[in-house]
């Protein structure tokens, strides 16, 4: 299911402007979401509210979010693709107005 997609723990120490970008092969339609969670390392199924960043429609090859202001706190970033059980390589880039305020680590499951 959806929550088996790659997830990353994101800790933000102070307010920042973020933009998320993913690139992959043109055969894979991708989406990126950043959801608030209560504690570092929680998976997206533990989200406390709606996503603060969502790239919306799945797009092939390259997806970029709008620049968004994000408050300090704990978040989970989830990279998903349109087709269930489809896997592939991707490059994720997180751009921040203050890179030292943002810490990212992969959630191993």
What role is predicted for each listed range?
Residues 1-109:
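Intrinsically disordered, low-complexity terminal tails and linkers
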């Amino acid at each position: 299911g959806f929550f088996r997609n790659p997830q990353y723990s994101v800790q933000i120490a102070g307010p920042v402007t973020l933009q998320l970008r993913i690139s992959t092969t043109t055969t894979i339609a991708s989406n990126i979401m950043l959801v608030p969670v209560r504690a570092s390392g929680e998976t997206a199924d533990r989200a406390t509210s709606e996503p603060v960043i969502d790239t919306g429609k799945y797009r092939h090859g390259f997806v970029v979010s709008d620049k968004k202001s994000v408050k300090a706190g704990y978040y989970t970033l989830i990279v998903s693709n349109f087709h269930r059980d489809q896997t592939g390589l991707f490059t994720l880039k997180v751009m921040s107005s203050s890179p030292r305020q943002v810490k990212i680590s992969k959630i191993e499951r």
